[in-house]
A protein has these predicted regions:
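Extended, low-hydrophobicity, polar/charged segments
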Residues: 1-156
């Protein structure tokens, strides 16, 4: 598997540093947390203690790059503990036969490596006609935590 950490961000269409700089230029307040590279929700839960407290909890998410039977590219964002049933999701978003997209297609369409999928990858995904679907309950979260295009950083 190709490394998805910030050490290799220069190989991405949009670097993590560039994304963070854009937030700052636009006056969007973010906090950046550096940690070991994490590729799964289980690994992510191990580093959450670095930045979570009773006052700064929030929405920890999982992100799935999917394709349907018609080759439509989809980014699904849900609460990290949500059980995902692709058949149910396919019905909800009016698609047929959802499956996980390949790592090559992930990079071509969202500009990130496996383990670093994030809503921020729509910075590349929009121009590649990737459709974004977010779980409604995430709107109730005070903060959302996501990778800024690499998997050894988290921003809120």
């Amino acid at each position: 598997m190709v490394d998805a950490s910030s050490k290799f961000q220069s190989s991405l269409p949009v670097s993590s540093d560039f994304l963070i700089q854009k937030f700052q230029e636009l006056g969007i307040p973010i906090e950046v947390f550096e940690h070991e590279a994490v590729k799964t929700v289980a690994e992510s839960k191990k580093v959450e203690k670095l930045f979570l407290s009773s006052t700064n909890g929030g929405g920890h998410i999982k992100n799935l790059y999917l394709r349907d039977a018609k080759k439509k590219n989809i980014l699904l964002v849900a609460s990290q503990d949500t059980t995902i049933d692709l058949k149910i999701i396919a019905n909800l978003i009016n698609c047929k036969r959802l499956s996980f997209g390949s790592s090559d297609r992930l990079f071509d369409n969202l500009g990130v490596r496996p383990g670093a999928v994030t809503p921020f990858s729509m910075i590349t995904g929009v121009k590649n006609s990737v459709e974004l679907f977010m779980q409604l309950k995430l709107r109730k979260c005070k903060l959302l935590y996501a990778h800024p295009l690499v998997n050894d950083r988290t921003v809120s």
